[in-house]
Amino acid sequence: MKIKGKVWKFGDNIDTDAIIPARYLNTSDPKELAKHVMEDADSSFPSKVKPGDIIIAGRNFGCGSSREHAPIAIKASGIRAVIAKSYARIFFRNAFNIGLPIFEVPELIDETNEGDEVEIDMNSGQIINLTKGKKYNTKPIPPFMQELIKAGGLVEWTKKRLSMEDIK
């Protein structure tokens, strides 16, 4: 499975409150959350992000409070993947649980600019900055995790599995 998109670049320690500010946590509607995603980090982001875009960021992306709203807001905005130097552990789990692929590639972050086009091959773990012609390698996403992503997250994957069990 390949993902290709334009890069949005953010720095270190982007916490869950910067991803989706607490003042919007009175809803869990993904479309509403998407209207405010990353607005405290870049006020133009919600209106300019396009389906298929990719976020890259520095260290400790998704730190702060444990809220599933953060990866939900990112995914609902149309972002297809996040690449960072490192992640807060709880964000890492929450992202895969809702079907948002994330990757750790520290050297890519320093060598990629906002607006560059990047292609990610989840099977091989190869990421190419198409704008600069640079290739990077990371761990491929295991087949089971790719199943979760294709299904739309753990809940949707479980629903499919349970409905398949009902058929047997």
Curated annotation (Swiss-Prot):
EC number(s) stated in the UniProt entry for this protein: 4.2.1.33
One Gene Ontology MF term: 3-isopropylmalate dehydratase activity
SUPFAM superfamilies referenced in this protein's UniProt entry, alphabetically: LeuD/IlvD-like
InterPro entries: Aconitase/3IPM_dehydase_swvl (IPR015928), AconitaseA/IPMdHydase_ssu_swvl (IPR000573), IPMI_Swivel (IPR033940), LeuD (IPR050075), LeuD/DmdB_bac (IPR011824), LeuD_type2/HacB/DmdB (IPR011827)
Similarity annotation: Belongs to the LeuD family. LeuD type 2 subfamily.
Complex and partners: Heterodimer of LeuC and LeuD.
Job description of the protein: Catalyzes the isomerization between 2-isopropylmalate and 3-isopropylmalate, via the formation of 2-isopropylmaleate.
Protein name per its UniProtKB record: 3-isopropylmalate dehydratase small subunit
Species annotation: Thermodesulfovibrio yellowstonii (strain ATCC 51303 / DSM 11347 / YP87)
UniProt lineage: Bacteria, Pseudomonadati, Nitrospirota, Thermodesulfovibrionia, Thermodesulfovibrionales
